[in-house]
């Protein structure tokens, strides 16, 4: 018996799930081993190139997904065609809105990404049968609501410097690998997208990035690679 099959029989967990970040996430972490095996049988891993849309606003999606790797940006398109980035999602976030067929947002890969896709009808059934999964999704919805309120504060009351620092902190806290005090990551958004997300001009974003570099809060390599030598210092900038 090979190691993979042995691991399955010993743990009852599908091999593909054992090293997956989402195994203990909002959805999979609330499932029984039997449910996890059933979900795994119907799931498909997909690699998504940056810029590819996985859910279109107004469309009826037949699937949900967990982010395995990469960053997704959530966008809202106005009737006149103007677009606003309204959120970012990272591994191992759950993408989708249970029991609502028509998507109110679009989801697009901001970076090269990998997702685990599974049928909407299957998970909807599991939700209706599993109180623990219902609670998990409810708790996640409340966390997202709290995060949205915090972001409203950022956009409405924080300075341009604090806005840029807040976005960098958001990305940094989801970056891997990271130590207790420092981290490094590639920006998943262009300067124009950052400006759109924060309600600033591109020039203001560039000036604030330069200022953060000059005072030593960040280091910038190859334009998009960011090093945060002291996470505590970055956090102090947005907690003042």
UniProtKB/Swiss-Prot annotation:
HTH crp-type domain mapped to chain residues: 158-232
Cited InterPro entries: cNMP-bd_dom (IPR000595), cNMP-bd_dom_sf (IPR018490), Env_Response_Regulators (IPR050397), HTH_CRP (IPR012318), RmlC-like_jellyroll (IPR014710), Tscrpt_reg_HTH_Crp-type_CS (IPR018335), WH-like_DNA-bd_sf (IPR036388), WH_DNA-bd_sf (IPR036390)
DNA-binding region: 191-210
GO CC annotations, alphabetized: cytosol
One Gene Ontology biological process: nitrogen fixation
GO terms assigned for molecular function: DNA binding; DNA-binding transcription factor activity
Keywords, ordered alphabetically: Activator, DNA-binding, Nitrogen fixation, Transcription, Transcription regulation
Cited PROSITE patterns: HTH_CRP_1 (PS00042), HTH_CRP_2 (PS51063)
Region (Essential for the oxygen-regulated activity), start-end ranges: 17-28
Stated role: Promotes the microaerobic and symbiotic induction of fixN, possibly by binding to the FNR consensus binding site upstream of fixN.
Further comment found in the protein's record: Possesses 4 cysteines which may bind a metal ion (possibly iron).
Protein name: Probable transcriptional activator
Gene, per the UniProt record: fnrN
């Amino acid at each position: 018996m090979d190691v993979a099959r042995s691991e399955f029989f010993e743990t009852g967990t599908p091999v593909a799930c054992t090293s997956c970040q989402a195994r203990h996430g909002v959805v999979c972490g609330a499932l029984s081993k039997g449910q996890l095996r059933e979900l795994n049988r119907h799931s498909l891993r997909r690699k998504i190139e940056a810029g590819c849309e996985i859910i279109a606003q107004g469309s009826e999606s037949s699937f949900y997904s967990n982010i395995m790797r990469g960053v997704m940006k959530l966008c809202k398109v106005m009737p006149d065609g103007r677009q606003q980035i309204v959120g970012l999602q990272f591994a191992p976030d759950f993408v989708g809105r249970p029991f609502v067929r028509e998507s109110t947002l679009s989801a697009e890969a901001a970076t090269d990404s990998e997702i685990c896709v599974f049928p909407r009808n299957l998970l909807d059934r599991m939700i209706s049968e599993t109180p623990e999964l219902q609670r998990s999704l409810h708790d996640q919805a409340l966390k997202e609501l709290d995060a949205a309120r915090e972001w409203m504060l950022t956009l409405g009351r924080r300075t341009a410097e604090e806005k840029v620092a807040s976005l960098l902190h958001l990305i940094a806290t989801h970056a891997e690998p990271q130590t207790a005090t420092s981290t490094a990551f590639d920006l998943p958004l262009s300067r124009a997208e950052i400006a759109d997300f924060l309600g600033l001009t591109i020039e203001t974003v560039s000036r604030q990035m330069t200022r953060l570099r000059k005072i030593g809060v960040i280091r910038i390599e190859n334009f998009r690679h960011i090093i945060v030598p002291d996470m505590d210092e970055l956090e102090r900038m947005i907690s003042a």
